[in-house]
Every structure is written in C-alpha cells, then in structure tokens.
C-alpha cells in the first residue's frame, strides 16, 4: 500500500466523507481511514436529514458543492417542509432517509473515486513534528504520511455504551472504539471534554398495533435538498404518532435509580435539546404525556425508530415502559436504546478554518468538535476539507461569516463561544436568519462552490439564470399595470390602475391570479414582501462587517490595554480572536471592553484599515 498521501481523513462518517470528497475534487490524493467500510455514513441515531435550521444547513452544503443533500434526495422515502405556515426565516425541509441505501450509495461513489484510497483500520497514534502534523500510525502498525489531516471520529473516541448498570466499551451500534486517539491528542497538547448522547430502541414494525396510533398523511410534493437532484417522490412513506402516558411515567420514575444517567454512572454532559425520556418525565412533571413518533429506517419499513424515547434504562425496564404505550403492547424489540459517552475536543482550540490552534495542518470536524447531528457534522467536514485543500495550495481559508450562512454561525459559535454540551443548530442562534433562508441558500453560497471548483460551470450558470429571471420578473411586474376593466380588478373590486407588484403585496390577492404558474413564485414573493426587513438585516450585517475589518495582531499584549476588565483579559487570551467583531461576540466581553480595545489598536496603529 502507498504510504504517502496529500491528505488523511480519519473517520468516514458524515463529516469525514464530505472532507474526503472536497479534498479529492481539488485533485488531492486522500487516504480515508475507517474501522468498518460497511458502516460508512451510517445513521446510528434518527433516520432523517434536515429539520429546523438543520435542513437549511444541508441546503448550504449543497450550494457549496457538498454531497449530503444530493445523496439524501436519492435515498429519501419521505420529505416535507416544516413551519410552512410560519415566516420564511424558519422554514426548512426534513426528509426520512433509507439509511442503508444512503450509506451504500456514498460507499460506492467513494470506491469509484480514483483520488480516494479507503483504508479499513483503526488509528493508534497521531504524530507531529515541531507542532506540525506529520503522520498517523494504524492499528496494523503501518505509518501513513500526509501534508494535512482532518480528524472526524464522531462519537467513537474512547466511547462506551451504557444501559442501566451495564457499561460496554464500544462505539455506536456495537462498533469498535479506541482510546488510542484520545491518548495521542492529550500528548500533543489538546484538552478533551466528556460528552454524552443517546438513542431509543428500534422495534419490528410487524409487532405494532396501528389501530391505536395516528397515521401521518402527506401529499406528494416536488421538494429536494439538492439542485443537482431531480428526484421526486411519487409516494410518501408514512410516519405514525402515539403518546406516553401516566403509567409509562410511573414505571420510569419508580426506576430512576436504575438509569445510567440518574444513577451517576454517566459523567459526560448530554444534549440540552434532545433529552432522554427520563429527563422529560423528570423535568416536565406537569405533563401527563409526551409524543412518540414511529419512523421507518428503510424503504421496506421492517425496523421502526422510536423518536422521542431516547433512554439509558436497563433492558427489562425499557421493555416494561414501552409496553404501556398505545400500539406497543405486543412489541418486539430489535435493539434496545442506550446512552453513549465519548471524548470531544475543546472547540476553543479551533480556528475558523477548523484547523487546530495546537497542531498546524491538522483539522477537526463533526461531533469531535462538540456538536450533535448529521447536518452540523457534514457542514464542518466540508469546510475542513475545503480549507485543508486550500492549505495545500498555500491559499487563504474559506471563512463564512454569520451573515453568509448557518454554517458560519455554527463555526463562529464553536470557535468564539465554545460549548460545554453537544451543540445543536437552532434558528434562534442566527441573528441574520432572515438573510439565511432555505430558499436562497444557492444564491448565497454557490459563488464559493464555483470558485473552489466544487460545483460545475453549468450548475453555477443555472443558479445565476434563476435569480436573473426573478429580478427581471419583479422589474416587469413593477411596470405592468392592471386595467380596471380586467377580470382580476372585478374579482377584487379594484377601482384604480395599480401595478402588479403592488397588488402582490395585498394580503387579499391570490398570487396565482397574477403570477399564474411562474416557476419561482415562492422566491419572488419572499423577496418583495420582506424587502424592508431584509434591507435592515443587511445593514446590520454590514455594520458588523466593518468590525470584522479591524484586525487584532497575534502579538497583542492584553495586559497593556487600559481599563480592560479582568474577565475580558482572561477570555481574550484564551480565545485569541482575530478581529474586533469576533471579540465582540465572546460572552463576558462588554461594549466598554470593545471600546478600550479599539482605542488601544488605534493608538498603537496595529490594525488594518
């Protein structure tokens, strides 16, 4: 086997494959290392992609030339728009995915890629020379060398599975794990955190009594994550809804001491926005029921994922409380739920490029950085892969701003604020969310994907044509006036000549009366109806960009900044922001601290105008 590559990617989950494909598209020779080739981009938790904010991230990945959206479209068995009745800033797609097909399609494309070498092995050591990445040593004893490395180990690093008092050294779904990488990272100077997440039981569909649950009825639609996919679902696979009840809660409360979480066995910090059923019963004691969704894991629907019932209870207690839930009285369990603890990096050790501050040419992406979710992981993998490729060419990294993308918000939060619990992207985290919509992801980011060579000239041209068409249509509508004798005027009792554009702003007007079957109706209506609000957010973003222009030198001595609060000094020394805008976003830094910092930089003339 060739032992010399341009890049090494450790881990072939959602982050790892994005990094590998991005590096390979830049014509680099990539070694992609994973424990088990049959588990590439497996979905150890929910069999879905997207959701609030997360669906927009997947759209952004696609606009940049990443793969998650494209393969999600090919493997989806259900797709819907969430928050459709709410404002456009919070709308997002969510799709149920055939998890086996998704993994298979990506594995096959990796195997076909001449720039990617798949290596089935563990990594036992990461080596650096004078704080610069050098090589990795495999479980086989072989040493692999490269100029750059992207670490994407997910929840596999020093991980253990917990059910009740049972603790098993294992990765997700009984996969291999390793403590060797954790040991190696500590020796290199990295600080590690201990995090926890969990997953519910899977059951056989044949054991469910569907007469006692609610069926989700969905219409066919033409939704897609990817501009490169034309797949349309002719038939949606249904999910089902049922509820826990007081008997369920009674069994859980009577056995709390047997839960790994509540017995004190789990030391890691769990996700705030994806609590276990034990947490929900304890924290929301006033509620006598909680939702449970039955989600098929594949197109054949043999196995059902019980969304809402993540647990670390022992197997016998799981069986007891599950049987109290309507529809599950005679259930057969394929796999019991569990909690998993794992090591993660301190994300404050990362740059915005996702290169680590500790070791040069060494990048990290995905759950190892303290995030949760396939979408957050894939986004980081793509950015790390892009920037590793740019590093190989001695070019500046791609750093997306908070006003550019949810991906920019995600990475900025990790790098500037850090996280003490598994980080999940929410629309509320984005201050410019009206700019970061589902419908304009391609408009916002395709220019970067094209410039980087990750999307083709034809794809980019099609996106440009789309928005040119929308602008031309708006211009046409502003100049075309409705005759008072027309059928539309009579229908809405319009007495004076009015431009079609102004008519579209009236709530009583049905847009189809004017736009007919115009292809980009949704995008056009959002643009004209929210023009004022969008303009204001752009102005806010522009003001913040001015602060981004004020650079903070690497060699700044914060002890010499007059009247800077002690807390501000401590945090600035640890986080080492590169601009005033980044310093402004650090928790505990006050406006007065920022003023003193700007005054100091102006006084000593060490900032870039």
UniProtKB/Swiss-Prot annotation:
Binding-site positions, NAD(+): 270-284
SUPFAM superfamilies on file: FAD/NAD(P)-binding domain
Residues in coiled coil: none
UniProt xrefs under PROSITE patterns: GIDA_1, GIDA_2
Required cofactor(s): FAD
A GO BP annotation: tRNA wobble uridine modification
Binding positions (FAD): 11-16, 123, 178, 367
Gene3D superfamilies the UniProt entry points to: FAD/NAD(P)-binding domain (3.50.50.60), GidA associated domain, C-terminal subdomain (1.10.150.570)
Gene Ontology annotations for the cellular component aspect, listed alphabetically: cytosol
Keywords from the named record: Cytoplasm, FAD, Flavoprotein, NAD, tRNA processing
Pfam family, one: SAM_GIDA_C
A molecular function GO annotation: flavin adenine dinucleotide binding
Keyword Protein biosynthesis: no
Binding partners and assembly: Homodimer. Heterotetramer of two MnmE and two MnmG subunits.
Function (record text): NAD-binding protein involved in the addition of a carboxymethylaminomethyl (cmnm) group at the wobble position (U34) of certain tRNAs, forming tRNA-cmnm(5)s(2)U34.
Family assignment from sequence similarity: Belongs to the MnmG family.
Protein name in the entry: tRNA uridine 5-carboxymethylaminomethyl modification enzyme MnmG
Organism: Mycoplasmopsis synoviae (strain 53) (Mycoplasma synoviae)
């Amino acid at each position: 086997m060739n032992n010399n590559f341009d890049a090494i990617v450790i881990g072939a989950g959602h982050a790892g494959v994005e990094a590998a494909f991005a590096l390979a598209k830049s014509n680099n020779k990539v070694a992609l290392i994973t424990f088990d080739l049959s588990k590439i981009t497996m979905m150890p938790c929910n069999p879905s992609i997207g959701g609030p904010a997360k669906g927009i991230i997947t759209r952004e990945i696609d606009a940049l030339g990443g793969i998650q959206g494209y393969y999600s479209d090919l493997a989806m068995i259900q797709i819907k728009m969430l928050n459709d009745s709410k404002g456009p800033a919070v709308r997002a797609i969510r799709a149920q995915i055939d998890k086996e097909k998704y993994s298979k399609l990506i594995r096959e494309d990796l195997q076909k890629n001449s720039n990617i070498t798949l290596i089935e092995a563990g990594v036992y050591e990461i080596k650096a020379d004078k704080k610069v990445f050098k090589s990795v040593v495999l479980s086989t004893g072989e040493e692999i060398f490269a100029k750059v490395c992207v670490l994407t180990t997910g929840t596999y690093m020093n991980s253990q599975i917990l059910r009740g008092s049972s603790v098993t050294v294992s990765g997700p779904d009984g996969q291999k794990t390793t403590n060797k990488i954790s040991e190696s990272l500590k020796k290199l100077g990295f600080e590690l955190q201990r995090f926890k997440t969990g997953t519910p039981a899977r059951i056989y569909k044949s054991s469910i009594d569907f007469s006692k649950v609610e069926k989700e009825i969905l219409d066919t639609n033409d939704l897609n994550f990817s501009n490169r996919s034309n797949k349309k679902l002719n038939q949606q696979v249904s999910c089902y809804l049922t509820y826990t009840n007081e008997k369920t809660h009674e069994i859980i409360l009577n056995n709390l001491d047997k839960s790994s979480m509540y017995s004190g066995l789990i030391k890691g910090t769990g996700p705030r926005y994806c609590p276990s059923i034990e947490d929900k019963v304890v924290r929301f004691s006033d509620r006598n029921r909680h939702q449970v969704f039955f989600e098929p894991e594949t197109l054949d629907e043999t196995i059902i994922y019980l969304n809402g019932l993540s647990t670390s209870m022992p197997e016998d207690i799981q069986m007891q409380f599950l049987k109290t839930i309507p529809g599950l009285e005679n259930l057969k369990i394929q796999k019991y739920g569990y909690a998993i603890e794992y090591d993660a990096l301190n994300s404050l050790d990362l740059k915005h490029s996702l290169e680590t501050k500790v070791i040069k040419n060494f990048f990290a992406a995905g759950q190892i950085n303290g995030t949760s979710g396939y979408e957050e992981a894939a986004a980081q993998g793509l950015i790390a892969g892009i920037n590793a490729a740019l590093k190989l060419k001695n070019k500046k990294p791609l750093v997306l701003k908070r006003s550019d993308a949810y991906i920019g918000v995600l990475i900025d939060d990790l790098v500037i604020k850090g996280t003490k619990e598994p980080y999940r992207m929410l629309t509320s985290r984005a201050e410019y969310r009206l700019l970061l919509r589902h419908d304009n992801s391609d408009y916002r980011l395709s220019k970067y994907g094209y410039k980087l060579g990750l999307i083709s000239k034809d794809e980019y041209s099609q996106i440009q044509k789309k928005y040119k068409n929308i602008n031309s249509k708006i211009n046409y509508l502003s100049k075309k006036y409705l005759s008072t004798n027309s059928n539309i005027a009579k229908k809405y009792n319009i007495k004076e000549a009015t431009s079609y554009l102004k008519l579209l702003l009236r709530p009583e007007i049905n847009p189809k009366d004017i736009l007919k079957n115009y292809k980009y109706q949704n995008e056009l209506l959002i643009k004209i109806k929210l023009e004022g609000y969008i303009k204001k957010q752009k102005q806010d973003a522009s003001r913040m960009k001015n602060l981004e222009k004020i650079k903070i030198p690497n060699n700044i001595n914060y002890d010499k900044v007059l009247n800077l609060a002690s807390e501000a000094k401590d945090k600035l020394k640890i986080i080492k922001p590169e601009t005033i805008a980044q310093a402004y976003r650090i928790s505990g830094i006050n406006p007065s601290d920022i003023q003193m910092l700007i005054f100091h930089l102006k006084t000593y003339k060490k900032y870039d105008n």
